[in-house]
């Protein structure tokens, strides 16, 4: 099962993420958990989130880039749900062997992330990749949709279909276990 942990603080203003979820939602074996819809008060049901993660084979953290990072509710979700003794540490094996993919949208182009002497966009994934690896997960190449503020509808739809195809490809590669 593919579990999408979706964190958009302003989903009503989303163009790219909305289309990505619409495409992903057409697939069987995909569960979407919209954190800002489920937890507008930021009071996360840790047991429910851990149960959802336990059902998943592939976990996707999907969100718009905010200040070169994840939205605040997704960070809080990580802090609460990926707990010691469950996700990592002594007896923390619940996520071991599962896969994690980062699906992120940005308003700027990929070159926008060439900051100083750093090599650009891939550097921004490092904390998320480190989190996945620390929890014993397999890190998959991220899915990034850039320039979403200036994309026309046709481009957004094409990118959302590309996202859907990534999920289909993963499902087909893992259908036998």
UniProtKB/Swiss-Prot annotation:
Molecular-function GO term, any one: NADH:ubiquinone reductase (non-electrogenic) activity
EC number: 1.6.5.2
Keyword Secreted carried by entry: no
UniProt-listed GO biological process terms: positive regulation of potassium ion transmembrane transport; potassium ion transport
Catalytic activity: a quinone + NADH + H(+) = a quinol + NAD(+); a quinone + NADPH + H(+) = a quinol + NADP(+)
Membrane topology: Peripheral membrane protein
Binding sites annotated in the UniProt record for FMN: 8, 14-17, 65-68, 105-108
Assigned keywords, A-Z: Cell inner membrane, Cell membrane, Flavoprotein, FMN, Membrane, NAD, Oxidoreductase
Cysteine disulfide links: none
Required cofactor names: FMN
Subcellular location: Cell inner membrane
Family membership noted in the UniProt record: Belongs to the NAD(P)H dehydrogenase (quinone) family. KefF subfamily.
Assembly with partners or alone: Homodimer. Interacts with KefC.
Name used for this protein in its record: Glutathione-regulated potassium-efflux system ancillary protein KefF
Species name: Klebsiella aerogenes (Enterobacter aerogenes)
